[in-house]
Amino acid sequence: MAILTREQFRSIAENKSGTRGLKGFVNENRTFSKSTAKTSIFLSHSHFDKDVVEQAKIFFENLGINIYVDWADQTMPEKTDGVTAQKIKNQIISINDKFVLLATNHAVVSKWCNWEVGIADPFKLPHKKFVIFPLADNSGSWKGNEYLQIYPRIEKNNRYAGGEGYYVWYPDGTWDTIEEWLNK
């Protein structure tokens, strides 16, 4: 198992985007409808990681998944307030099927990301609809080790059935391919 670095993830997204490139991908009006996407994901992330959010959108959309990113939602208030919190809570609990924390070093210390994890935990975790996607700094350091002990996580692996790919690892030691998890 391997936690990807930001640079490795950028390279993966760049390969998946082809000639399209990585910039502006979140703000473009190219989304999957609920009827055509396998599932939809609320992507919890730090706003300091907009570059990685672009890459995550490419990564998941190449799997046929619709991604919700709060700052790309035109219905959100300009300044965060109670309406913002209520809209995010509704997106996590009612509208999106799954929850993914893009767990960069910025995200694991973000008050908003930790609040979103607290909202998603009781609604998504019992149904295996909650994962973290840890991304280490390019030096390989990652601050969220306690998350690995209690939450399922996405990692790259090449040692199990199906060969190299992305797997969801559960705290009890079991795993699914990312495709299996997305189809649950």
What are these regions (language model features)?
Residues 29-69:
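Short, contiguous, helix-prone interaction/anchoring segments in small proteins
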Residues 100-102:
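Hydrophobic beta-strand scaffold positions of dinucleotide-using enzymes
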Residues 124-130:
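A short helix->loop->beta-strand "cap" motif at the edges of active sites that frequently abuts
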Residues 1-33, 137-184:
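C-terminal interaction surface of TIR/SEFIR-family domains
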Residues 64-89:
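Conserved BB-loop
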Residues 95-96:
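An anion/phosphate-binding loop that grips the pyrophosphate of nucleotide cofactors and donors
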Residues 105-123:
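Conserved TIR/SEFIR loop-to-helix hotspot centered on a Trp-containing motif
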Residues 73-75, 105-106, 132-141:
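Short beta-alpha junction loops
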